[in-house]
Amino acid sequence: MEEALLDPTNPYAATKAAAEFIVKGYQHSYNLPVIITRSNNVYGPHQYPEKVIPKFINLVERGRPMTIHGSGQNLRSFLYVKDIAEAFDLILHKAKPFDLINIKANCEVTVHQVAETIWRLMKKEGNVEDHIQYVRDREFNDFRYAIDGTKLEKMGWEAKTSFEDGMKATGLLGIIGLCVVEWYQSHPHHWDNIESALDAHPTLPNVQVNPMVL
């Protein structure tokens, strides 16, 4: 629930909580009509490849293994960009100043399922497991990010796009004409240099591990 006490479990989560408190501080000090939103992971065309979906697509396109932190069983919820754009539009028109609103995805998948889906949609041959490299898990990597979306649902919004449909969807707002996978395949040089973004641990050495002993 939106009103639940914030209890960050790691430094990254603490920065998210701190950002909210800074905004609330300005809100109370200057009576700014602030609305705070919290959402699940957003994905779609044009997303920078440091995020898991474009990262995996770009790695496969380059003939490199998809690097999975830990066992790959961590759960993540994904929101297609069109859905969250519609949520923002509704919030701007219907929410009240000082509201705090969760934007909840309608699906939850493991990171391993993300890799499987991308491999299948890219129509690659062979066993996907042969093209996955398990690396040491991130420090303080939460197993799951779950939020309650009841408040926004009562306002008339819910995510319409399943993860599978979002990966097949025809680009940003249906205008580009390419599904998520096809967009990255068609724009390999959209960014000058993404090699550092494709590293499993940009600041740590890649250490291959056996997922069965994690």
Where are these regions (language model features)?
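Catalytic helix-loop patch of NAD(P)-dependent Rossmann-fold dehydrogenases
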Residues: 1-36, 43, 47-49
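C-terminal substrate-binding subdomain of Rossmann-fold SDR/epimerase-dehydratase oxidoreductases
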Residues: 60-214
